[in-house]
Amino acid sequence: MSLRSCSTEMIPEFTVTEITDLVRQVMHDTFYCIKIRGEISGLSRPSSGHVYLSLKDDNSVISAVCWNGTRLDVQFENGLEVICTGHLSTYQSRYQLVIEGMVLAGQGKLAAMLEERRKKLEKEGLFDQARKKPLPLLPLKIGVITSPTGAVIRDILNRVKHRFPSHIIVWPVQVQGSQASAMVVQAILGFNNLEEPPDVIIVARGGGSIEDLWPFNDEELARTTAASKIPIVSAIGHETDFTIIDYAADVRAPTPTAAVEIVLPERQQLVSDIAHKLSKIRSAVRNVLGAKEHRLLQLYGVLTETKHKISEVGRSALAHQEKIEFLFKVALLKKQQYLDNLIGRIDRYNKEHIISVGYAVIYDNTGQHVSSANAVAPDDTIVIEWKDGKRRAAILT
């Protein structure tokens, strides 16, 4: 109906407030429970706890709000394609969707979004093996981040009890819904800030749909996991389920119970391994001692043989010494005999010897020995020496 086809008297008149209230009532009565499919954008989380966002498709955008206290199975994240359940309301002359429920839509797009995020973080080096921390050999204290109720925590505690009893600290969190990833982040930070932190952390939840596991694809959670000073083992879902936290964690376990088996050795197996290693150590020590003993015996044999050789050399040296002394004495005796003979010969030509046997020695007046008659002339004075005295004489002819 156009304005020209009706009488102005027939057009109802409203105040601004009246028409606003009427539109609000019409929208509430008509769209009191609807589903809207769209992509989340413009996400805002003020301190009030309310969540403000927009839902968009290729052509249009609608504002939406989720009041603080509304429990959802999926957390808000820009880029997610979701189906929101709620009702339309007006606010400041505009209408908006009040969200009361939300599920993920378009799993193909979710998978593409997840792969894009994984590649981004991988390119940053967040998943590098060099960043991974080794697990302790035998942790005395284990931190577990999971729901305080349900099968997962029971399975973990039961497996710990039967495998190797250890001190378990449970940090209770939601493992599904819009608050899950933030609670897990706070739990990891909380464990790292304890004065006596656990030796290792297990982050666990049971299996579920991609929507159920989506909180563990959160980028902030991945960064917090990689930055943890305490080694983290992720155990999210079943063996075929992979989430971003699995790449960021130091070790990924296929199931929560498998995480316990990775973290803790089996008690009996540990005892057996220790006994086996002790046996190997004893055997190695025996082998080393045996080899050293054999070497000592060899050295003792060498020393004994050397001692015998030294004794033989000593005896030989003594024999040579005695022989040398004997030869020296013989040589000395011969020299003594030769010397005595020489002295005897010299003595025979000695003046005193000659005189003693009846000969005399003649000297001229200068005291020189006269050995020839031609050495003196008539009237020369000479001195004649006998053994018992001297006499002066003159040469007559």
From Swiss-Prot:
Pfam families xref list: Exonuc_VII_L, tRNA_anti_2
Catalysis performed (reactions): Exonucleolytic cleavage in either 5'- to 3'- or 3'- to 5'-direction to yield nucleoside 5'-phosphates
EC identifiers of the protein: 3.1.11.6
Gene Ontology cellular component list: cytoplasm; exodeoxyribonuclease VII complex
Keyword flag Signal: no
GO molecular function annotation: exodeoxyribonuclease VII activity; nucleic acid binding
Keywords assigned: Cytoplasm, Exonuclease, Hydrolase, Nuclease
Keyword Cytoplasm recorded: yes
Subunit structure: Heterooligomer composed of large and small subunits.
Family membership noted in the UniProt record: Belongs to the XseA family.
Protein role: Bidirectionally degrades single-stranded DNA into large acid-insoluble oligonucleotides, which are then degraded further into small acid-soluble oligonucleotides.
Protein name: Exodeoxyribonuclease 7 large subunit
